[in-house]
């Protein structure tokens, strides 16, 4: 039997919300360049993620894309928000590793319990419902002990925003997508002297 939480369309688009007052979010880790694949060297392919498993990464991508969807400008996927999160979990965000690992598993189980299918296979409206349930803390409590659903949701929300708005050198905001969306100049390099010559 399918169970769902009350669903209402947000009064404004998520893209509009992203443009209101979120310019100051900053990321904290270096981005990575592309990896050349050289035939004949017998090297193992580099793993897709530093911390996440492929299954965890696929689920988190879907969550991040609901938070910052693709429309007329790139969303969370194209701007590399998940790679920002993945890299930071192996550095300054290491204390959040278990929150992500347990939270993703609890969220996976929540979707199977309520909708009888993985989050990745749900319709857009069902995905919104599922995320709304953990945002409000109305997900099945038996599946959420540590972390609580709201703690997990707020952490993913904050880190997704940081990955979208931070400097590309930190692993997200590929091609300065958020700055271009907001019509901002690229920020100056810290420490550079910008005083004009007299």
Model-predicted segments: where are they?
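Mature-region segments of soluble proteins
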Residues: 2-4, 58-62, 66, 73, ...
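N-terminal secretory signal peptides and thylakoid transit peptides that target proteins
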Residues: 5-25
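C-terminal segment of N-terminal export signals and the immediately downstream linker at the start
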Residues: 10-16, 29-67
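Short low-complexity stretches enriched in small and charged residues
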Residues: 17-21, 43, 85-88, 176
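Short alpha-helical scaffold segments that flank and stabilize functional sites
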Residues: 20, 24-27, 67, 106
């Amino acid at each position: 039997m399918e169970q769902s939480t009350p669903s209402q369309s947000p009064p404004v688009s998520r893209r509009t919300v992203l443009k209101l007052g979120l310019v100051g979010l900053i990321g904290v880790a270096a981005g990575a360049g592309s990896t050349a694949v050289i035939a004949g060297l017998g090297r193992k392919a580099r793993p897709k993620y530093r911390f996440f498993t492929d299954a965890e990464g696929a689920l988190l991508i879907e969550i991040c894309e609901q938070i910052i969807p693709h429309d007329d400008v790139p969303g969370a996927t194209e701007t590399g928000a998940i790679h920002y999160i993945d890299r930071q979990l192996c550095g300054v965000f290491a204390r959040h590793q278990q929150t992500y690992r347990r939270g993703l598993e609890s969220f996976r189980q929540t979707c199977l319990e309520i909708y009888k299918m993985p989050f990745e296979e749900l319709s857009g409206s069902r995905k919104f419902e599922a995320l709304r349930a953990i945002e409000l803390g109305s997900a099945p409590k038996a599946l959420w002990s540590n972390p609580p659903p709201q703690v997990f949701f707020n952490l993913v929300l904050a880190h997704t925003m940081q990955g979208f708005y931070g400097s590309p050198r930190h692993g997200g905001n590929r091609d300065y997508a958020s700055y271009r969306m907001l019509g901002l100049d690229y920020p100056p390099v810290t420490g550079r002297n910008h005083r004009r010559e007299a």
